[in-house]
């Protein structure tokens, strides 16, 4: 029996991708772990069945090189593609730097699309599965995350369309709506632009950006174990994992949008 294969983007130490790589490895997979810089994956280097690949999902040449490498290794198949690499951006929409905002979409939306397009022949050959790591923010639309939430909402729409378009080829598409998870992606010394109209709320926004707000978070390892279980046992669709993810599901499913906005408005008041 041939060993199953998985490619995971964004596997820098301390993040979700790294935890996913370790859990897949424990399940007996050959893991192709990627990050912009391989030194950020040195904790994975000595594991057998673990191939580290330098990959920036915004660079088509690096994606093409990864396709060629994996084709040679597997004979032209890939069982699972996990699009995990992503960037956050906590900023009031009025203060958004548009170049930075476009870069968020390059990583969070166009990056996964590039990966899917380039690896589709390998996935179709294996009748494989595409997994897009998304966020409950794409549905709950929290304050100060307008650009990030928009990029993830676009990814969700793309995933649901792909789920239908790829079904004739036997390829499954799974979206993982992620709640709060303990990672190392937070910013430090957060500051709003000096002319921001939101200076009254800078301390509150900074706490969110720096991860110092009093919110409970699921460990990345527990999250990864549950997500890998979903990946191996589901036939595509949408799953919710991470702290408060199930709560977010029920809020979106049962609560009218105008009621969902009420607690958000309470955070900023009205003028």
Swiss-Prot record:
* A biological process from GO: phosphatidic acid biosynthetic process
A GO term for molecular function: acylglycerone-phosphate reductase (NADP+) activity
Q: What does this protein do?
A: Short-chain dehydrogenase; part of the gene cluster that mediates the biosynthesis of the indole diterpenes penitrems. The geranylgeranyl diphosphate (GGPP) synthase penG catalyzes the first step in penitrem biosynthesis via conversion of farnesyl pyrophosphate and isopentyl pyrophosphate into geranylgeranyl pyrophosphate (GGPP). Condensation of indole-3-glycerol phosphate with GGPP by the prenyl transferase penC then forms 3-geranylgeranylindole (3-GGI).
The EC category is oxidoreductase
The record's keywords, sorted A to Z, are:
NADP, Oxidoreductase
Q: Which residues are listed for NADP(+) binding in this entry? A: 8, 34, 40, 56, 84, 148, 152, 181, 183
Q: Which gene encodes it?
A: PC-15
Tell me its EC number(s), please: 1.1.1.-
A Gene Ontology cellular component where this protein is annotated is: lipid droplet
- Give the record's family classification: Belongs to the short-chain dehydrogenases/reductases (SDR) family.
Task: Name the chain's protein.
Answer: Short-chain dehydrogenase PC-15
Pfam families per record: adh_short
Query: Where along the chain is the active site annotated?
Result: 148, 152
From which source organism is this entry? Penicillium crustosum
Q: In which pathway does it act?
A: Secondary metabolite biosynthesis
């Amino acid at each position: 029996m041939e060993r199953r294969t998985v490619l995971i983007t964004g596997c820098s130490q301390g993040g979700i991708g790294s935890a996913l790589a370790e859990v897949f490895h424990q399940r007996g997979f050959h893991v192709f772990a990627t990050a912009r810089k391989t030194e950020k994956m040195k904790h994975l280097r000595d594991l057998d069945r673990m191939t580290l690949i330098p990959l920036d999902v915004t660079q088509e040449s690096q994606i093409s090189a990864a396709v060629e490498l994996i084709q040679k290794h597997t004979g032209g198949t890939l069982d699972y593609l996990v699009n995990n690499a992503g960037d956050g951006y906590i900023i009031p929409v009025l203060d958004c730097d548009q170049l930075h905002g476009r870069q968020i979409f390059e990583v969070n939306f166009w990056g996964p699309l590039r990966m899917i397009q380039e690896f589709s022949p390998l996935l179709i050959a294996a009748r494989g599965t595409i997994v897009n790591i998304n966020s409950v923010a794409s549905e709950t639309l929290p304050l100060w995350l307008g650009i990030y939430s928009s990029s993830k909402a676009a990814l969700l729409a793309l995933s649901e369309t792909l789920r239908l378009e790829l079904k004739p080829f036997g390829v499954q598409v799974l979206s993982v709506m992620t709640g709060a998870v303990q990672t190392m992606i937070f910013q430090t010394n957060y500051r709003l632009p000096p002319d921001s109209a939101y200076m009254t709320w800078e301390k509150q926004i900074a706490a969110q950006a720096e991860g110092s707000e009093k919110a409970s978070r699921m460990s990345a390892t527990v999250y990864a174990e549950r997500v890998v279980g979903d990946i191996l046992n589901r036939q595509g669709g949408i799953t919710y994992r991470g702290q408060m993810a199930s709560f977010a599901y029920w809020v979106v499913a049962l609560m009218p949008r105008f009621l969902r906005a009420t607690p958000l408005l309470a955070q900023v008041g009205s003028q």
